[in-house]
Regions:
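Gly-rich Lys/Arg/Thr-decorated short loops/hinges at beta-loop-alpha junctions or inter-strand turns
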Residues: 17-26, 222-234, 317
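Conserved, mostly hydrophobic/aromatic
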Residues: 58, 263, 329
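Glycine-rich phosphate/diphosphate-binding loops that line cofactor/substrate pockets in enzymes
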Residues: 43-51, 253-257, 351
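Internal helix-turn-beta structural module
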Residues: 303-346
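Active-site-facing alpha/beta catalytic cores
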Residues: 2-5, 72, 85-240, 244-245, ...
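Conserved phosphate/anionic-ligand binding catalytic regions in large, soluble enzymes, centered on
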Residues: 54-67, 325
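N- or domain-start disorder-to-order transition segments that initiate the globular core
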Residues: 7-46
């Protein structure tokens, strides 16, 4: 008899179950309050019951937890300064989609050396999320792998489905059962209809195969997620202008979806030039100041230090500097947050 399975699997290593990790690192009362309130507030902003703007801001990816906590402490201070205008959520990304190959993130390879200590990565990721939430600062992340949410989702206030996975059925099913609001990005080439389709799918109940926190295969029955929205991240060209907002709103309206839009200032909208986020921010603040209410959120790729660096020389990494996409620095981040807060105040005065 011929062997017909696992022909291209060279090894297998079991990982800790989600239930074991959650037992070892339980969510605190403080963190649960942070997550609960942030999800409620985001939902209200999305549905325009709250006049503020949601801002998901932080490093492209997390590779150094000390720098991440340093950043979180700074961001918490800013969130208190602008609590009447902005709902600030820290971008805490542990998984990186790759166009071909490359470092897949802290969970997959926490030591940055291709050792793939995923147990360690899951533990580090969960501990960091606990620490950030205990500060009273909510965390947002991209759900790339459909199993890892079992390990961290109770500590996530907002989630994203990326441009490469918005069309994926399993990610739409995941979103439909998610306890937190979910943003779907437009496609890598800029198409918004796929995101509208994803929102429409996630609104509905689904039955799908997944893995329980104990590590057993099971059929999950989701009830649908009413707190889903589109994220404009650009594509073959930027899509944050007023004309793009109008076009996106028309697509949402024609699909009987709420005209609530988040703009990603990075990626295709910055033409992958991190300083261009400041140009995008200026345009968005002008729109908001003029009374644009359909923009309910923004995303910013930001770090302590500007730009990015290679992770090949681990002994000489610059503290607080990205090893994936280039980010704006902390001073520019504060400028953006101030501009956004002033724009929200101006919009409120018009209303």
């Amino acid at each position: 008899m011929h062997k017909t399975s696992d022909l291209r699997i060279s090894d297998r290593q079991e990982v800790i179950s989600a239930s074991s990790l959650l037992s070892d690192q339980p969510i605190s009362k403080e963190s649960s309050e942070t997550v609960y309130q942030a999800r409620e507030n985001f939902s209200k902003i999305l549905n325009k019951e709250d006049h503020r703007l949601s801002v998901v801001v932080g490093p492209c990816s997390i590779h150094d937890t000390l720098a991440a906590i340093d950043y979180a402490g700074r961001l918490k201070e800013e969130s208190l300064n602008y609590e009447d205008q902005l709902q600030i959520i820290m971008r805490v990304y542990f998984e990186k989609p790759r166009t071909t190959v490359g470092w897949k993130g802290l969970i997959n390879d926490p030591d940055l050396n291709d050792s793939f200590q995923i147990d360690k990565g899951l533990s580090i990721a969960r501990q960091l999320l606990r620490d950030i939430n205990d500060l009273g600062l909510p965390a947002g992340t991209e759900f790339l792998d459909v199993i890892t949410p079992q390990y961290i989702a109770d500590l996530i206030s907002w989630g994203a489905i990326g441009a490469r996975t918005t069309e994926s059925q399993v990610h739409r099913e995941l979103a439909s059962g998610s306890s937190c609001p979910i943003g779907f990005k437009n496609s890598t080439y800029g198409g918004v209809q796929v995101a509208a389709d994803a929102i429409g799918s996630a609104l509905n109940p689904h039955k799908f195969l997944s893995v329980t926190k104990e590590g057993r295969a099971a059929v999950f029955y989701s009830s649908g997620n009413k707190d889903c929205h589109v994220i404009l991240r650009g594509g073959s060209k930027p899509n944050y202008s007023k004309e793009d907002i109008d076009a996106t709103a028309e697509i949402l309206k024609s699909n009987n979806l709420a005209e609530s839009i988040m703009v990603d200032m990075s990626h295709g909208n910055s033409s992958k030039q991190h300083k261009n986020q400041l140009i995008v921010c200026e345009d968005i603040t002008n729109q908001i100041s003029s009374g644009e209410s359909r923009i309910t959120g923004v995303m910013i790729e930001s770090n302590i230090e500007e730009g990015n660096q290679s992770a090949k020389d681990l002994d000489n990494l610059v503290y607080g500097k990205s090893i994936t996409d280039a980010c704006i620095n902390w001073e520019d981040t504060k400028t953006c947050l101030n501009q956004l807060a002033e724009a929200v105040s101006a919009r409120e005065n018009i209303a």
